[in-house]
Amino acid sequence: MKKLGKYMNTISAKDFNASMAPYVDEGIKRANLIGNRGPVKFDSNGKLAKDILDAYHHNGFYVFEGFVSAAEIELLQTEMQDLLDRAPVDNGAKVDKYGRAAFGQEFARPVYTLIKPLSDPWGGTMALNGRHPTQMTQPLGDSTLPEKVVFAMEGMCQIMSSGLRLYGHPSLLAIASTINGEDFVPYMDAIFVKQPGVGGAVSWHQDGVTHWNSPNWDEDIHGFNFQVQLYDTSAKSCLWVLPGSHKLGKLDIKKIVSDNGSEFLADAVPLHAKAGDVTIVNRQMLHGSYVNTSSDQRVSLTIGFHRKSSVIGQRGALNEAGDAFYDEKRIDERSQVIAVAIDSRGQFYPNEPRFTYVPMQGREDTLRFNPDNWEKVVKNYNLKDLAI
């Protein structure tokens, strides 16, 4: 197989797409042998079914098929397309591609991150605590590509009404409770965007940075991320993972990629999915994604959760300032967004059973979805994310 990587950034997008074909075929075969996908199931106590939980713990991932209804996905797609249309032309710009005021300027943190098409903005840099030590191939596009494209978006709960409702989805929260305990807490959320033929790469990495040397370390100490897929994504555009790597501690990623001879890791598998599928990936899993030279539109709504015990008493990491301290007050304030999201969903889907979030039990009346709580609890909620 052709060796590609940070020293091979003169390959064309067309040739890179072709070079992936045998790797994709083999990856799909490996994924099919593992399985780890199917509809979500719960036991009589409302907990994630044991066979699914065991499969998740063994491999570090699962693909829940048909998780979000087609009607809800359509609402999410509609809002997402509007947000992409209203994106600034570059980071820090005030106008969109039509010359209108760009969306999101009222929020404390920028909503959008834009990058050069087909680039790997974090790979080989010290961004995000240096957790992306290698860089993916960045193929050359043609002259018709835009200068910048949307790569990621922050603040799903404040920029999308449907996103806030999704955050209160009872099945998502029931899974979080099963894995992280009834007092589970939020991590953060982000939207990864890989538009057809221009989407950027996310180089191989493990998400967690805080607890690698903890005396209480175990495979779940850094939590997990859901990704709700808004569109069908093939193995050429989706996330790839190295099964079982969440059990191995902090990995020498540079050595793994070097020993492999290319960024196409031999044992990795693709988490290809349909619109409405939801993937769950342990944050200690080695994972990444390649530039999107395919015709797929990939938009992944990423929602993370932790054990409370992993977060309490810790200081900021990743996108949070190092002097941020995760005390009871900060954890409680950030967790209130879950309660407001549950009520927002309940108002919109009145016939759907609501999830009972134990940390907010008894405070439901004060955490209703209304204009006051949108201003007090939801707006700029991501300033209180709990990254570890």
Predicted regions and their residues:
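Non-heme Fe(II)/2-oxoglutarate
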Residues: 2-42, 86, 117, 252-254, ...
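Non-heme Fe(II)-dependent double-stranded beta-helix
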Residues: 2-58, 65-204, 210
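A structural signal for short, well-ordered beta-strand segments and their strand-loop junctions
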Residues: 63-66, 185-188, 238-241, 280-281
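Short helix-to-loop capping/linker segments positioned immediately adjacent to catalytic or ligand/cofactor-binding
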Residues: 163-164, 174-175, 212-216, 228-230, ...
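A structural signal for short, well-ordered beta-strand segments
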Residues: 189-191, 226-228, 301-305
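Short, structured patches in soluble enzyme cores that scaffold and shape functional sites
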Residues: 190, 195, 206-208, 228-232, ...
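Acidic, His- and aromatic-enriched active-site or binding-groove loops in soluble protein domains
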Residues: 203-223
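Double-stranded beta-helix
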Residues: 220-224, 228-290, 310
